[in-house]
Amino acid sequence: MEKTSYVMTSSYEIEKQLINREWTEDQIGNEYRKHPSLRYLHSSHNFETGMTGVAFEDTTTKEIIIGYAGTNTTNDAWNDIRTDVVDIFAGAGGHYQSAFDFYEEVKNRYGDRITTVTGHSLGGNYAQMVAIEYNIPNGVVYNSAPLYLGTTELVKGGMNLYNASRQPYLAHIHTKDIQKLLVVENKINNYTGDMVRIRSKDDILNVGSEVGLGYS
């Protein structure tokens, strides 16, 4: 837990440097505060989606931990809030590709040693989807935004309505959302890793999840 907490916290600090272009990646590696058993490897910020990923190596096991920064209301507020509202509340899920790309980049650079993903808030959402997409053995997420919120039940309701009425236009409206939902559910069901979720009761996104509006 202590290592994932460190990586999660570091993701926010490194994100600030990447957005403001205050440090190059080499400077981050050379100047970033040290951890007794973790070594900084790589980081990246996607200016279109607001995704920031960081990678650290456990110097004892040589395993890699990937962390994703969460919603940032100071540095890249618009992209993160847009992702929260459009992609999570609306179930669009369009932000995941940048998180997948970062995972693939780290894997290609450093080998298939990624055993843990972590993140807070929106970053926890990224971490969960990356974990189930690549069946990563371990995940620790903090107050994670759910994978889907709001439209999950609406989509299911739309399918029920379509089945009852057999009206083609209803199928057209809901087909894409239903397909996305079923794909996510299938990946969740096939995930064999261990996902630890740490949350506080007053987190607004998790409140929605707890009443049955999403997966987290």
Predicted regions and their residues:
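Serine hydrolase/lipase
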Residues: 60-63, 132, 136-216
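Generic recognition of flexible, low-complexity loop/linker segments
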Residues: 53, 126-129
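Gly/Ala-rich beta-loop-alpha elbow adjacent to hydrolase catalytic centers
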Residues: 118-123, 127
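A conserved cap/lid and substrate-binding interface adjacent to the catalytic center
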Residues: 6-118, 134-138, 145-157
